[in-house]
Each structure stands twice: as C-alpha cells, then as structure tokens.
Amino acid sequence: MTAKAENKPKILIVDDNVPNLELLQAYLEDIDCQTELSTDGYDALEKVKDGSVDLIILDVMMPRLSGFEVCSRLKSSPETKNIPIIMVTALTELGDIERAINSGTDDFLSKPVNKLELITRVRTMLRIRDLTDKLERTLEYISEIESKLENN
C-alpha cells in the first residue's frame, strides 16, 4: 500500500448517484479508510494518476464512460493495473458479471450493497494488495542480489 496520512488506505468510490456515494463513504469511514469521491468515469481516471489510491469501488452504469470501460482502461495501464477494483451494480445477469470479469474487475457486488459484505471484501482486497506489493518488492530485491552475484 502506498503511504497515506496516518497509514489509512485510500479508496476511490465512483458512482454517479450521490446518495450511493455518501452511503459507501460512510461504510468505509467506519473502518478507518480515507475516501475520495468521483461521480464520473473520466474524473476517476484522472484521480488515480497520482498513485495514491489503494482500491477502487466502481459503479457500472454511469453516463459518458461506463464502469466496464473505466475498469478496462485501468487494468490495461502499467501504472494502474494492480489497483484492486470492486464493481458495484444493479446489473445481476450472468452476462453482466461475465462482462465485469472480462473488463478486469477483481470483485463484483450487487446492489443494494450489504455493509458487512462490502467491508469484508474491501479488507480482503486490501490484504491481497499488501501481499502483492510485498511480493513485488521481494522479487526486485532477489533480482538485485542475482545481478550483484553475476557481476562478481
């Protein structure tokens, strides 16, 4: 996880419905997470560029740029591909779930969102993110050692 104020994970919540944003924000602040809000897919893409976001909760049905497209763009970029994404949507058909998975989402929740389920999934995704970061640092360290050994 990237360094944050007081080491709180930073979660970007993207939904064009402001009451939904505020509800999800309240759920996440209850578990001591920093939140940033976005009502638009293009705005969300801009907000992740600084590398400070640890996880994204992403609505699917938004005007201008769907959550599917936002997810696909984030997962195809080397800078953002490792940010976990939980899609949240009223779409529950198998085809919609398949489309979400094919766009690169890490998890999928149906609306209305259950607070306990959301919190559990967020904690799991953050734990996986931490382990992935540690693994990448370890692999870089091993690579450096191998390089030094080859040069000696």
Please identify what each model-predicted range represents.
Residues 52-58:
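Active-site beta3 strand of CheY-like receiver
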Residues 18-36:
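Two-component/phosphorelay signaling modules centered on CheY-like receiver
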Residues 62, 74:
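Receiver (REC) domain active-site loop signature in two-component systems and cognate sites
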Residues 1-12, 25, 137-152:
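Non-catalytic signal-transmission and effector/linker regions of two-component phosphorelay proteins
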Residues 113-122, 126, 130:
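C-terminal output helix
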